[in-house]
């Protein structure tokens, strides 16, 4: 999927995260993480985000994450929502989302 414009998903409430995704003109995935649990779970959060982007075939994006202790399932859902909003997806293929 090609990121067409910036988009957000999520909140800054406890146990949630806010994802901002935008086109990366330099190419590739650039991930900026700000997390209350980064010291302990930063690597795992990055893995979930990158795996989700790879599964959605997003190869060029600047992703900024502000995490407040979200679980993996929430991270995946928020990244998926931000990507679909940034790509203007109208018909969601629910079977392709995991």
Curated annotation (Swiss-Prot):
Record's GO cellular component terms: cytoplasm
Domain of life: Bacteria
Protein name: Citrate lyase acyl carrier protein
Function: Covalent carrier of the coenzyme of citrate lyase.
Protein's gene: citD
O-(phosphoribosyl dephospho-coenzyme A)serine: residues carrying this PTM: 14
Subunit structure: Oligomer with a subunit composition of (alpha,beta,gamma)6.
Keywords, alphabetical: Cytoplasm, Phosphoprotein
Family: Belongs to the CitD family.
Pfam families on file: ACP
Compartments (UniProt record): Cytoplasm
Major location category of this protein: cytoplasm
């Amino acid at each position: 999927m090609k990121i067409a414009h910036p988009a957000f998903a999520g909140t800054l409430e406890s146990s949630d995260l806010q994802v901002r995704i935008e086109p990366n003109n330099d190419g590739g995935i650039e991930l900026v993480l700000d997390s209350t649990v980064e010291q302990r779970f930063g690597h795992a959060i990055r893995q979930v985000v990158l795996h989700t982007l790879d599964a959605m075939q997003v190869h060029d994006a600047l992703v900024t994450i502000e995490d407040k202790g979200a679980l993996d399932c929430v991270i995946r859902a928020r990244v998926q929502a931000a990507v679909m909003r940034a790509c203007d997806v109208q018909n969601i293929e629910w079977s392709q989302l995991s």
